[in-house]
Amino acid sequence: GETVFRTPLKKGYSIDLSIEFEINSKTIRSQHYSRLNSIVKLLKFEKKLKIIVEGHSDKLGAEKINIKLSNERALAVKNYLISKGISGERIKTIGYGSSKPAFNYENNSNINAKNRRIQIVIDN
């Protein structure tokens, strides 16, 4: 099915596509392409819409590495969107490392996986 956005898309609105990454990986898993394609469709329909791709990591490992990895994850998503015809000028990226966890946890591997994620935020 197609993703339909029923909420008006205003600056700061966050879209959680449940795109998660393997440990120490910046590679987008193929099962997430359809979710990213819903953003491609949205950006092709809303020609003036700009977004911020936020990369996140779990708390495992050194924060310096987590920030680098979360930046690389955000950039991987930006590059995917560009490969589908979206102008890179419409997409900002930022990596937060482990500073904004979706879930707080005590060393739980399922929750760690949910914190290794991407969020899309409306920028205008």
Regions found by a protein language model. Give the residues of each.
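Periplasmic peptidoglycan-binding/tethering modules of Gram-negative envelope proteins
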Residues: 1-50, 124
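Periplasmic OmpA-like peptidoglycan-binding domain that tethers envelope proteins to the cell wall
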Residues: 27-33, 54-124
